């Protein structure tokens, strides 16, 4: 449903850990500054991540439908946030529905966020801050994934040589 689509979109759109998504409060969404506040993430540090315009639209649709109070993604009793276990289970169901055969978890969304930013040319130090990593070494794990993609890219030189060979 819309609730989980919104929650998974927050995880990917902001590079959040599952526990960070489940513990978001409505007040953590700052639509004026287009930021999401992560309160006491891993390492007991607060940080901000970007709030994309498309994510804001999705969150507003979700808010209008669900009318959450307090927690952005409340649990069944609405007093507590959705549990990380429930979030993980819903992710598994969504992956089965999408017929994703690869072994993935909500953390894959965070990994994809970092990898896609890196592949898009975002400085690794910016990615480090967005992910809330204390050490750059932790963030460099994502460069290994990006290197696989780099190998698949055709060099402009090869494209030029092919074009010249075809014109010859």
Label each residue range with its predicted role:
Residues 1-168:
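Conserved catalytic core of the tyrosine transesterase superfamily
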């Amino acid at each position: 449903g819309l609730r989980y689509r919104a929650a998974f979109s927050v995880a990917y759109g902001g590079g959040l850990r599952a526990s960070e998504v489940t513990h978001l409060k409505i007040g953590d969404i700052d639509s004026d500054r287009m930021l999401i506040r992560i309160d006491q993430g891993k390492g007991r540090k607060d940080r901000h991540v970007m709030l994309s315009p498309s994510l804001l639209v999705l969150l507003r649709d979700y808010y209008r439908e669900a009318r959450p109070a307090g927690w952005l993604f409340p649990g069944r009793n609405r007093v507590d946030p959705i549990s990380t276990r429930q979030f993980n289970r819903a992710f598994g169901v969504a992956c089965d529905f999408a017929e994703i055969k690869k072994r993935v978890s909500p953390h894959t969304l965070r990994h994809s966020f970092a990898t896609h930013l890196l592949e898009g040319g975002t400085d690794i130090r910016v990615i480090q801050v967005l992910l809330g990593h204390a050490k750059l070494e932790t963030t460099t794990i994502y460069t290994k994934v990006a290197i696989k993609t780099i190998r698949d890219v055709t060099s402009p030189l090869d494209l030029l040589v092919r074009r010249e060979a075809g014109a010859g």
